[in-house]
Amino acid sequence: MRRGRLLAPLLILVTALASVSATAQSVSWPAFGPLRNLLRFDGFTDTVPDFVGPIDGSAQLTIFTEGNHYPVLLPLVLQRFPEWCRAHQACDADPAGILVVTLPQPMVVRMLTEGGISLGNAVLPVGPDKPVFPDLVMAGLAPLRQLRAAGVVEGQARIFAHTLGMGMLLSKTVAGVDDLDQFSRRINRLIVASPSEPGARQQYRATLAAQLGETATAQLFGHEVVTFAGRLGIQHRDVPYALINDLADGGLIFSHLANFYAAAFPERLRALGVPGAERFGQDIAIVRTTRSHALAVSFERFFMEVAPTAYPEGGFAVLGPTFGAPVDL
């Protein structure tokens, strides 16, 4: 299966889960990029989440992106793009010199408009006059328009992917749930995108309301696990973490991520589809910033060649003629 071929190299990188501590279990996330013989800190959901690559200003290519397509994007950026450069003799891309930041869209917007991010007690400045600043930004159209209004990105983006809406991700300890109606009636502890990700949260709620009605939707959200120790406000980390640690019974998350995590943690998690959810899917687009390096041009060329097949293989919609459509911001 084509999707299986895409997931295979990622799943090889998923290490065994760490032993159970008194209160929580560390979840070993898929690792990307070259191995470095450096001191490393890994907390319960990784100490510095969703920064892949150097943050000292040495990166040849820097991409800030909404994080929910990372299972497709990171292998393309860190493996296939350097291979493409060598094969076409078009560029020289060292994966050790590429930085990809994969955070929720509101966090990406805040980093770029407020000038940085605090990582615990450490502060990483971000800006066109700072060592760290993206060449390219990938996100939905609404956040890209915010960045355009702030003068961060150029005026035209191109659509490269469309999500297929939400799916269900369940702990394998939960039995008797095979569809959305059963999910709504039997899940007593729900984990879902927090208010820090309003776009995804609203999309899931709208899907539930269309499928189940407002009353059943409100009842299900009444069982939401709102917070827990170590929650990041990043659904692609919080949802599987809560399920694996028995902090929740079932979660709502993008369907491609539900399938990815069920394949990554087959002993712990299972995924279910939601027929009809695809009509609530959303576009993801790419745009250059006001400070793009030369390598970004080569990456865009490569990316727009491979994305039409790589994203459907990873559980996204087939875009057809709408792929690459320019959108004014």
Show the residue positions of the predicted features.
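Bacterial N-terminal signal peptides
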Residues: 8-18
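Early extracytoplasmic/lumenal segment of secretory-pathway proteins
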Residues: 25-145
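A conserved helix-loop-strand patch within extracytoplasmic ligand-binding domains
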Residues: 35-49, 129, 133, 141-208
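Ligand-binding cleft/hinge of the Venus flytrap
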Residues: 79-92, 161, 179-233
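Hydrophobic residues within well-ordered alpha-helices
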Residues: 112, 183, 240-246, 286
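A ligand-binding cleft/hinge motif common to bilobed small-molecule-binding domains
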Residues: 138-149, 240-270
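Periplasmic-binding protein-like
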Residues: 162-165, 193, 265-300, 302-329
